[in-house]
Amino acid sequence: MSDKHIKQTVLNSNDNRISPSHVCDIFLPQNGLSERWKAFTRRRFVIAETGFGTGLSFLTACQQFTQFRQANPTATVKELHFISFEQHPLTKSDLIKATEKWPEFAHFSQQLHAHYPPAVSDCHRIVLDEGLITLDLWFGNITDSMPQVWTNDDGIVDAWFTDFSQIEAADIHQTTEGTTTESITIENNASESSATESNAALLKSLTIINSIAILARENSTIHAITYHQGNQQDVLEQSLTEAGFDMTESHNHRNSISPTHRLLVGSVKNRQYQANSKPWFTRTSATDASDVAIIGGGVASATTALALIRRGVNVTLYCADSLPAEGASGNRQGAVYPLLNGSNDCLTRFFGPAFFYARQFVEQAAMNSTFSHDWCGVTQLAWDEKSTSKINKMLSGNFPQELVHALDIEQTKQKTAITSNFSSVYYPLGGWLCPQELTRALIKQAQDTGRLTLKSDVDICSLESTNEQWQLTDSTGNQFTHNTVIIANGHRFSEFEQAKQIPAYSVRGQVSHIPTDDTLSTLKTVLCYDGYLTPQNTTTKTHCIGASYRRNSADLAFCEAEHQDNKQRLVHCIPDVEWPKNVDISANQSRAGVRCASRDHLPFVGNICRYEALIEQYKDLRDNQATAETVPIYANLYSIVGLGSRGLSSAPLLGELLASQICGDPLPLPHTVLNALHPGRMWVRRLVRGKQLGSKS
């Protein structure tokens, strides 16, 4: 089936099968949402559906929930979380066209359009109405995506919108290889090919039902539209019943669905409690998330604080300096673009969605604050054989053109408005921003809510667990008590006894500030080589080039050699033109900062593990994985460290991830990536292989 045919099928199926009034007639009442919202005792209500299409169900739910909140302002439920899956996502232009016919949803559809991502696989989190509504949009085959959705023992979904009749429509003319259909009988007179397709679609539906059951909470409701096709409907109903749903057929809305379809409704009874993560990668929420302390004053602290505050959490931010963003987040300009390769490994699967979320986050922040930034694009030069090979490998990943694409020499010159004599790749959605201004703007926004207390010049130097709370002691002996603590102080994480074994390290980086000139002032994009050069910051009339890289150094003093090397790398990488040689560094204007990095280029985000207990508990993990117990952790103690040089692209999603985990909300990344971000991952990898652990293994 061609992409064009699939796209038209999605558009037609959503336009012709159902309307906003039908959604209100079928999906919402059959799940009893209005009455359930009134009696709901949790802060966030989670709906999941099996096909996003044009977003009609999502938009209708947004409108209905908002109207409910307006009519019931004292209700406990404050937020709506919507999880949806789509194997064949529409382009943004097609989505806009499809939703134009529903002007009543304009408030929500315009926000959806603004942040709707390109067709990159995995989860894309979109936040609407300042966090009151959250959409997790999973692109890819639903049978691959659903097992990647994290859940705890209790489940995460409160209501399911499912349409099994669309499974077969989406899979027309697609063959399922290696599938056994011997146990399924479909009574029809169709051709052998048609029967095979129907059997494959049914097997896919059964796989989906298993995932639905794993993700559903106790008392979670479901509506399921199925085909009237032989005994297929009975197989699906039986499977839902065996999965824990008490199912009945609804005859109240026969005029709202096709006569060839059937509507089943039900709810979960006696759920079998089961998480879907390995015990050594467990992510535990806080036992009390009402009061959280964050140690640190950079962009990771600011994004995490704002994500928590959106969830109604009171946050105290302990900053060792007199002002936030005086450390690694204090630079004038930083590039924002994703770290991609052609392997579809955890780096790509994290940094792709993280970059899209960072753009969304920055654009939303800019609506309420002023900070220097420019989505001017990022150009990465193929300046030598190694960089060319790396770029070619990355391009083999077949990413959407709107994310990254190749430029020849002439196109590179036109795009950058500067001569380099190299081909390149271009990230059209990338750009630069001022990390210091952004961080301070975010903290100001958080303070304006009344939920953030900023304690400047308070250098927390030790933590102690006392009476199920954390006691924080600063450098002058003052003590503070909080229920939950987040360590987000960059390379200084190792000063805390509980976190010192996390295998991250410090990296000194010095950025040079250079005055603009006639050539540099024309630069239109961030230019990356074995270093980077930013376009002019119109506020300072300067550019940034850098940065040096000195591992295991926390020295902040100006270094003449590193200053010279910043220019020399520019000259070395772009040798055949004059303008790099004319860059003026004579004023010795620069800034040094210390980043916190990891060997695998991924941060450490989540529960902090008890290192010695982990070694003892998992000493035989290679041979006893089936009986392994949950990883030992420090209760209510978390980290967000090791962001390296990609903090601007990753911090917003990491802050959202950590806030989601602490508050027990659905997580915005697939299992595989969550495991790759776990603070204990490197220790567990060695233990699984039967290797011993040493210091910072």
From Swiss-Prot:
EC number: 2.1.1.61, 1.5.-.-
Renumbered residue ranges of the record's region tRNA (mnm(5)s(2)U34)-methyltransferase: 1-269
Cell compartments where the protein resides: Cytoplasm
Main location, first listed in the record: cytoplasm
Region feature FAD-dependent cmnm(5)s(2)U34 oxidoreductase, mapped onto this chain: 295-697
Reaction it catalyzes: 5-aminomethyl-2-thiouridine(34) in tRNA + S-adenosyl-L-methionine = 5-methylaminomethyl-2-thiouridine(34) in tRNA + S-adenosyl-L-homocysteine + H(+)
Essential cofactor(s): FAD
Signal peptide residue numbers: none
GO terms of biological process kind: methylation; tRNA wobble uridine modification
GO cellular component: cytoplasm
GO function term, MF aspect, one: flavin adenine dinucleotide binding
Pfam families: DAO, Methyltransf_30
Family listed: In the N-terminal section; belongs to the methyltransferase superfamily. tRNA (mnm(5)s(2)U34)-methyltransferase family.
NCBIfam families noted in UniProt: MnmC_Cterm, PRK01747.1-5
Job description of the protein: Catalyzes the last two steps in the biosynthesis of 5-methylaminomethyl-2-thiouridine (mnm(5)s(2)U) at the wobble position (U34) in tRNA. Catalyzes the FAD-dependent demodification of cmnm(5)s(2)U34 to nm(5)s(2)U34, followed by the transfer of a methyl group from S-adenosyl-L-methionine to nm(5)s(2)U34, to form mnm(5)s(2)U34.
Name of the protein in question: tRNA 5-methylaminomethyl-2-thiouridine biosynthesis bifunctional protein MnmC
Species for this entry: Photobacterium profundum (strain SS9)
